[in-house]
Structure formats: structure tokens, C-alpha cells
Amino acid sequence: MRRHMSKRGGSFSRRAMLLAALGLAGIAASGTALGADIAIVVRPDVPVDNLTFAELRRLFLGDRQFWTSNLRVTLLVRAPGAREREVVLKTIYQMSEAQFRQYWIAKVFRAEAASGPRIVYSSEMAAELVSGMPGAVAFVDADLAPKGLKVLKINGLLPGTKGYPLH
């Protein structure tokens, strides 16, 4: 007896394979391998090479607003849904997505910051903006950190080193 297959659906295994392929394509399209380290990147003229984890946290929380007396920090943060953002929310901010949004709304409302972080939609966009914006700092997949930008050490460690905190 022949099994009937609808013209719309196909078999269960075909659907499962298609969904699995789409899932893998989504991971590949995100540009970030699961478990890859996250690099903090700045322009080469930023006068900092190393940050302690506490300093990094203050930077991304907007508590440190200047690199030097005349070079303002501009935070660039990946859009919601990016793996890099999830890692940074968990490790640096130690907040959920909702807490992060509320934190920046309150900080701007209290006039502790002129605005929240600027949103970027890819590591490539982050790198391009950091290159052209004095004082900008962003986080990108360490494997995609572009040449020409400075990768900051965290607690004296570069991405890929044992003990590096952002992964």
C-alpha cells in the first residue's frame, strides 16, 4: 500500500532535514561559530591596550565616558539576537535583554548618559564604524576581528588565550 504524501508537506524526514539545513545556514550566516571568543575592538589611536574586567564593565555600563579628556567613548552594541550580544549581556552586563534596555532607558532619563549604545547589525558593520569613529568601541567575533583595528586585552589576555573571559 502506497503512503499518501500531500503536495504541500512532503515527508516528515524531508521537513526535518530542511529545518536542520536552515538552522545550520542561520548559524553560518551569523558569522559566529558557537563558542568563539568575543574581541573588544577600537581604533589604533585609542590610548588603551589592556582593561581589567572591572574597567571593561564600567566602560560598557557607560560609567567611563572618555578614553582621555577629549576623546569620548562611543559604545557600539550588536542587535538583539546576535550571539555576540548574548555573550556580552551575560558576561559583561550580567543582565537579561529586558534589564539591559531598562538600564539604558533609566541612565538616559537620569541624564547620566546622552544616549544608549548605538546598535550595529554585523561584525563587519561594527568594524567599519569603529574604523571611522574616533573613540568607538565594539565587540566582534574574535575570528572576524579586522586588521587595522586594535584588539584590547582583557586582564592581560587576548582572545584565544586560556582564561580569556569573553566566550
What are these regions, as identified by a protein language model?
Residues 1-10:
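N-terminal secretory signal peptides that target proteins for export/translocation
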Residues 13-18:
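N-terminal export leaders
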Residues 19-25:
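Sec-dependent N-terminal signal peptides
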Residues 11-12, 98:
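Short alpha-helical segments used as structural interaction elements across diverse proteins
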